[in-house]
């Protein structure tokens, strides 16, 4: 049986890895923004956008090149979350017990919520300038577009990571009860 201090230490290590991975994951978005800001007609960005033009994406007609490349990069968030999951699988420990109904509900509902999020953000075309007022206002400024894509990447990353841990957590909780 592990004591509380070692559980806290292990979870702190897993959380530090989580913070490091999300920062590493967001750096390319900042690089895309800087490259576009310095040279709006950058060959690298154009090449990425044209080679992925058939993929569905969330773009803004105000800035189609930068938003296309940022959206394509946001589609890589599940892969980085999977790598993090593999690295922190044995480190992260459970803190408290929950009842069996909550565990089963989370096992059934979290994949459905994740599937809806991934479908909406990764497999549909969406024009930001035709959305509701707050999003439409964000879509007309490069800095707010960067914030939008940072949020999008973070949402996809964290929901993937949480969804990957749900069955493991359920298994550990149910195993602990027996």
Curated annotation (Swiss-Prot):
One of its GO terms (cellular component) is plasma membrane. It is found in: Cell inner membrane. The keyword Kinase does not apply. It comes from the Bacteria. The chain crosses the membrane at residues 14-37, 69-89, 106-123, 143-165. Keywords: Bacteriocin immunity, Cell inner membrane, Cell membrane, Membrane, Plasmid, Transmembrane, Transmembrane helix. One of its GO terms (molecular function) is toxic substance binding. Residues 1-13, 90-105, 166-178 are cytoplasmic. It is a multi-pass membrane protein. Its main location: membrane. GO terms for biological process: bacteriocin immunity. This protein is able to protect a cell, which harbors the plasmid ColA encoding colicin A, against colicin A. This is Colicin-A immunity protein.
């Amino acid at each position: 049986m592990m004591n509380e201090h070692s559980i806290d230490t292990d979870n702190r290590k897993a959380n530090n890895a989580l913070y490091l991975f999300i920062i590493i994951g967001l750096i390319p978005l900042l690089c895309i923004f800087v490259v576009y800001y310095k040279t709006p007609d950058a060959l690298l960005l154009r090449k990425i956008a044209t080679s992925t033009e058939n993929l569905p994406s969330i773009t803004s007609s105000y800035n189609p090149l930068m938003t296309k490349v940022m959206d394509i990069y946001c589609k890589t968030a599940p892969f980085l979350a999977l790598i993090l999951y593999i690295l922190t699988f044995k480190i992260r420990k459970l803190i408290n017990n929950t009842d069996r109904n909550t565990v089963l509900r989370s096992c059934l509902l979290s994949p459905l919520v994740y599937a809806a999020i991934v479908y909406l953000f990764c497999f549909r075309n969406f024009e930001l300038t035709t959305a509701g007022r707050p999003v439409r206002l964000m879509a007309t400024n490069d800095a707010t577009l960067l914030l939008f894509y940072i949020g999008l990447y973070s949402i996809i990353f964290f929901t993937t990571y949480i969804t990957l841990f749900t069955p493991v957590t359920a298994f550990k909780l149910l195993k602990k009860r027996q």
